């Protein structure tokens, strides 16, 4: 099974025969190279401290700036996003957005959509995050 969507929610799924461990890559840490995902929690307040594990920048953190956001590039309209003030680079898209619970445990909050340009086409550490609930709702059984 290969499934992908570009709109209204941008994500992809691949069914393979392995037993994955739900974890976040944290390779810059000598002690905690994997952070185990314990649960999925929706972000419910501005100012919440969240982190990203990206391929290029690895783990870095910021604060929620806006809930219930949307973005459009003129071709695609995407809602069900929230905005976090944290830096990301090309290649970090698709990385998990998470909240630290304990040293090796995290809560999954979203998936990085990418940097969002402002009116002057500057990113300025503005990051769009796809909500986990919007992804899960696509596959929810009636």
Label every model-predicted segment.
Residues 57, 104, 116-118:
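Residue-level marker for beta-strand->alpha-helix junctions and adjacent short loops that shape enzyme
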Residues 87-111:
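Catalytic nucleophile loop of clan PA
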């Amino acid at each position: 099974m290969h499934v992908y969507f570009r709109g209204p929610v941008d994500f992809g799924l691949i069914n393979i025969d392995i037993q994955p461990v739900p974890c976040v890559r944290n390779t810059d840490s000598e002690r905690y190279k994997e952070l185990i995902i314990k649960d999925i929690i929706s972000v419910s307040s501005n100012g919440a401290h969240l982190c990203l594990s990206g391929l290029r920048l690895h783990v870095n953190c910021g604060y929620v700036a806006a809930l219930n956001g949307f973005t459009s590039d003129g071709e695609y309209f995407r809602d069900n996003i929230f905005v976090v003030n944290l830096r990301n680079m090309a290649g970090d898209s698709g990385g998990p957005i998470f909240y630290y619970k304990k040293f090796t445990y995290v809560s999954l909050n979203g998936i990085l959509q990418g940097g969002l340009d402002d009116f002057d086409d500057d990113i300025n550490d503005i990051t769009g995050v796809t909500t986990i609930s919007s992804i899960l709702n696509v596959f929810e059984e009636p």
